């Protein structure tokens, strides 16, 4: 990957991330409150659906930029060593590495954002200060493991499926795809990936919102999933799946469509 491609991926990824996170923030708030242990209405219901948006705004650009720079760089490195049949494996590896890097930026902003969403009467700044006072800087990374373990399976489904759908559409029309077509493929791939990984998203939300020192806050994903299963059953494991699928399908359309458009413009 040369400098021009690097810059294009950086800017396109950052712009795409900002577009999605700010446009669809209310759906994300509703999803978080549906998944919280205290329940939807106690967590704020439909009140203050933009609570936590400053945290999302700060983290969106660098988070998405870090993902796509890593994703495109990894694809570029392995492109000369793999055949067409092995392309999905390259996409899976690239997406996994991208998520590991991006989560270093995403998790602290996600922790603050979700705690503010679940406590809309408290400002983002106050939530940040409280988190630092109670748990220190390390507390901002609570849920890093659960976030990575949610994002990697998600990306293992979304990005190979996105690339596959684009390739099929490209072959059928015998030429280059428009950005809106890449966006449609992104919406379909994102919706499928969002639904199948909802239980992991529920576990991540419980871990991030748990009080410091509790067993849930320890970050043991299998234990948290069992706790959700025992207390709420299958509906609990898929709590928030409808807004999550809606959010990520629309997000996939905007995110991947905007990414393709901006990147092609810069190249």
UniProtKB/Swiss-Prot annotation:
Disulfide bonds: none
Record keyword Mitochondrion present: yes
Cellular component annotations (GO), alphabetically ordered: mitochondrial inner membrane; mitochondrion
Transmembrane regions listed in the UniProt entry: 5-25, 49-69, 85-105, 142-162, 182-202, 238-258
Membrane topology per record: Multi-pass membrane protein
Catalytic activity, reaction form: S-adenosyl-L-homocysteine(out) + S-adenosyl-L-methionine(in) = S-adenosyl-L-homocysteine(in) + S-adenosyl-L-methionine(out)
Localization per Swiss-Prot or TrEMBL: Mitochondrion inner membrane
Keywords in alphabetical order: Antiport, Membrane, Mitochondrion, Mitochondrion inner membrane, Repeat, S-adenosyl-L-methionine, Transmembrane, Transmembrane helix, Transport
Primary location class: mitochondrion
Single GO MF descriptor: S-adenosyl-L-methionine transmembrane transporter activity
Domain of life: Eukaryota
A biological process term (GO) from this entry: mitochondrial S-adenosyl-L-methionine transmembrane transport
Residue spans of the Solcar repeats: 4-77, 86-168, 177-265
InterPro entries registered for this protein in UniProt: Mitochondrial_sb/sol_carrier (IPR018108), Mt_carrier_dom_sf (IPR023395)
Function: Mitochondrial S-adenosyl-L-methionine/S-adenosyl-L-homocysteine antiporter. Mediates the exchange of cytosolic S-adenosyl-L-methionine, the predominant methyl-group donor for macromolecule methylation processes, for mitochondrial S-adenosylhomocysteine(SAH), a by-product of methylation reactions.
Family: Belongs to the mitochondrial carrier (TC 2.A.29) family.
Protein name: Mitochondrial S-adenosylmethionine carrier protein
